[in-house]
Amino acid sequence: FWMIPVAVLKKLGGFCPLFYHYGEDKDFVNRLHYHQYQIGYSPKVFGNHDRKYRPITHEGFLRTEYVYHLSEYANINYPWIKAFGYSVLAVMKKAMTSLISGKFRLSKDYLNMEVRLLARSQEIHSYRKTNRLSQPHYIQK
């Protein structure tokens, strides 16, 4: 559950369009930290999605991995080179580790993920620049 003051949403600009449906929470928290906000939570509060349990598929696992590495790439708390290392280079390492372990399909999937991240480098760079500003850039009037 989120309780975010309107002033904070306006200062941070709302949720970044780079993240659709997954990853927006991690990105928003990264931006809260960057803009010197603190986060509180209540360990006794429990939230649950109202849906059936579904086992994680290979595709679901890869999507989770992609969103995680995308959020690392977009993390404005890191200098560009560190963000690149925690995302693109980390995915490359996973591809090589999978290859060495004989997990050829997984290695190929990670290489594909690396290409997808690299293809979005310019877009990510632009969002990183925008997200450093304190203005309601993603909030529509």
Predicted feature residues:
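Short linear sequence elements within intrinsically disordered, low-complexity coil regions
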Residues: Y20, E24-D27, H33, Y78, ...
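A short, conserved alpha-helix in the catalytic core of glycosyltransferases
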Residues: F1-G13, L18-F46
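Residue-level signal for well-ordered alpha-helical scaffold segments within enzymatic catalytic domains
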Residues: A7, K11, R31, L70, ...
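Non-catalytic, C-terminal membrane-associated alpha-helical segments of glycosyltransferases
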Residues: L62-V67, W80-K141
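A broad detector of the eukaryotic-type serine/threonine protein kinase catalytic domain
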Residues: G14-P17, K52, K93
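Flexible, glycine- and charge-enriched loops at secondary-structure boundaries
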Residues: Y22, T57-F61, F104
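A contiguous binding-surface segment within folded domains or other stable secondary-structure elements
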Residues: R31-Y86
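Surface-exposed beta-strand edges and their flanking turn/coil or helix-capping segments
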Residues: D27-N30, R54-P55, T97-S101
